[in-house]
Amino acid sequence: MSDPSKTNQCPPPCCPPKPCCPPKPCCPQKPPCCPKSPCCPPKSPCCPPKPCPCPPPCPCPCPATCPCPLKPPCCPQKCSCCPKKCTCCPQPPPCCAQPTCCSSENKTESDSDTSGQTLEKGSQSPQSPPGAQGNWNQKKSNK
């Protein structure tokens, strides 16, 4: 009796809360853990205690020559999680879902330059609004 009860219990990340092992495939909905292959293979039990056996694919189309020491488990040994135009990704994203996983470094530098210009422009603009804000505060004080 313990066996059927275990079979009925189904881990939420892999199988839905409905009956664990219906006549249909175990996981009709492809969860994020296994985007391409089914979550529970027909040969294996419907809901194994272990997580999805299928490893997440690595959509990073970058060769092994990419100078990226960080190789997360999501990417195979032949694939690095950084494009050719990038040095490396300091924070390896989850399975390199975004092909531009390293563009964050470049964007960070660009943002720094842009933010500097924005601050200069911003410092000039705020000089006008302060008067409006001051009047608003006075109105609130009167109330």
Curated annotation (Swiss-Prot):
Residues 113-126, 134-143 have a biased composition (Polar residues). Testis. Is selectively expressed in the spermatids of seminiferous tubules. The lineage of its organism: Eukaryota, Metazoa, Chordata, Craniata, Vertebrata. The gene is Smcp. It comes from Mus musculus. It is found in: Cytoplasm; Mitochondrion membrane. Involved in sperm motility. Its absence is associated with genetic background dependent male infertility. Infertility may be due to reduced sperm motility in the female reproductive tract and inability to penetrate the oocyte zona pellucida. Keywords: Cytoplasm, Fertilization, Membrane, Mitochondrion, Phosphoprotein. It is a peripheral membrane protein. One of its GO terms (biological process) is binding of sperm to zona pellucida. Residues 101-143 are annotated as: Disordered. It comes from the Eukaryota. This is Sperm mitochondrial-associated cysteine-rich protein.
